Amino acid sequence: MKELYVVNCCRTAVGSFGGSLKNTPAAELGAIVVKEALKRANVAPENVDELMFGCILTSGLGQNVARQVGVGAGLPYSVPAYTVGMVCGSGMKSVIEAGRAILAGDADIIVCGGTENMSAAPYASTDARWGARMGDKKLVDTMIKDGLWDAFNNYHMGTTAENICDVWGITREELDAFGAASQQKTEAAQASGRFDAEIVPVPVKVKKEIIEFKKDEFPRAGSTPEGLAKLKGAFPVGPEGVEDQIVHTFQPTEIHEADTRKHVQRVTAGNASGINDGAAAIVLASGEAVKKYNLKPMAKLIGWGQGGVDPKIMGVGPVPASRQAMAKAGVTIDDIDLVEANEAFAAQSIAVARELHFDMSKVNVNGGAISIGHPVGASGARIIVTLLHEMLKREDAKKGLATLCIGGGQGVATVFEKC
């Protein structure tokens, strides 16, 4: 069987909503990281067989964002590209599809990843094309509609996190403790330069000057559980009796009865991920390509998994996906030295950690999406980049797991072994 190698990878710093990257198009962010990833990998653009890139909020961006990324990065016109759409899992799904293509013998070197500018997502009119006739009309926020809204139950992703609190018995205190811990870990990581090696600067215009944007700007220094406890609930709770309406695709075993206050708001801006901008790129190659071009890979991709859950509790999608990925890789959770589990919400992160029996000292050691941010189309690739760079810094970190939940009730996971 062919071996799959991550030759190199990088990401932009993550921008806040309406922050430093708001005027940088998603395709441009993607092109910057692809160009840098190829440079770091020592792979010539003409040796790339295909580009696969995630992007969710594509309204108004023009045809095939991935193609724009590839051409913008200097790939020859002969190199095909396609845009991957699996909501939050898109960046990681691109890696899985690249792995499949290489194993099938269709390619030897594929650039994958994801990009998103949530700040630039437009508002849309749904009735203007055929004539609004008269009266005021409503605009649709495509950032919410296409990125953060459950199409099956007609409510925000935040409500699915409230549902998880109800099912798994997760308290507001647990959520705020988790959110504060994420912020504190990221604050320490930034202070020590832990992210420096994985970030490629993005030139941005500030007034009349061009500066380099190279530090995640979403983290909130000084966060504490006590401070987060003062924040108000951000999302409507799920309907009464939602626990009895959920169809479980795996049997929950770690349900706590700690919180009897069902259907009260617990999810806040402090224990949920942000709305953010950013991009990440990964160069994946076959073993044959590694030998042919004398490449120096970072890690092997040794397994992946995908799974589905009831959309009402979409955040626990990583449970079946991670189990599948680890089974394919021939490992158990005890073999995993580092975990990057995307923090869409503290609620789902806690439920996933319980069900997968995570050792929390190994999970998101430099913080996660609650502190770093969650540019939806890029996050699946971003957490792989962060995982692999952290594994390189730790001599005892041999194997790593990266996983995300996906709006609509899915999960995706990948397992890596350090070279």
Where are these regions (language model features)?
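Flexible glycine-/small-residue-enriched beta->alpha junction loops
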Residues: 109-164
